[in-house]
Amino acid sequence: MAPVTSKKSKSVKKFVVDVAAPVENDVFDQESYVKYLVEHVKVDGIVGNLGNDISITAESDNKVVVVVSGNGSFSGKYLKYLTKKYLKKNQIRDWIRFVSVKQNQYKLQFYAVAEDDEEEEDEE
């Protein structure tokens, strides 16, 4: 009996990063984030070698979409790593965090800052 060879269909993964909150507060630049991702994504060990497997685009509704098709290897952890590097480079890592909303959907949101009412009362 001949071995059965299965042909893997080319899977398409889509990662969506919602950057609406920081963009609305003029803290985050969506275009520079997309440019950073394009320049720093590694494919086959080469930085910036996206080819036809990976496309990174910015949508008008404050979302960045990373589409991986074919044999492109890309994970959510790698996207999180690159985003954290971008935030650290632009010195906004202390205020914004990268949060997973659903599978392959992420969001940049501000850290929750609890206002200390007790300190305000003590000062009065």
Curated annotation (Swiss-Prot):
It is found in: Cytoplasm. One of its GO terms (molecular function) is RNA binding. Gene3D superfamilies: 3.30.1360.210. One of its GO terms (biological process) is cytoplasmic translation. Keywords: Cytoplasm, Ribonucleoprotein, Ribosomal protein. Its main location: cytoplasm. Belongs to the eukaryotic ribosomal protein eL22 family. Component of the ribosome, a large ribonucleoprotein complex responsible for the synthesis of proteins in the cell. The small ribosomal subunit (SSU) binds messenger RNAs (mRNAs) and translates the encoded message by selecting cognate aminoacyl-transfer RNA (tRNA) molecules. The large subunit (LSU) contains the ribosomal catalytic site termed the peptidyl transferase center (PTC), which catalyzes the formation of peptide bonds, thereby polymerizing the amino acids delivered by tRNAs into a polypeptide chain. This is Large ribosomal subunit protein eL22. It comes from Candida albicans (strain SC5314 / ATCC MYA-2876) (Yeast).
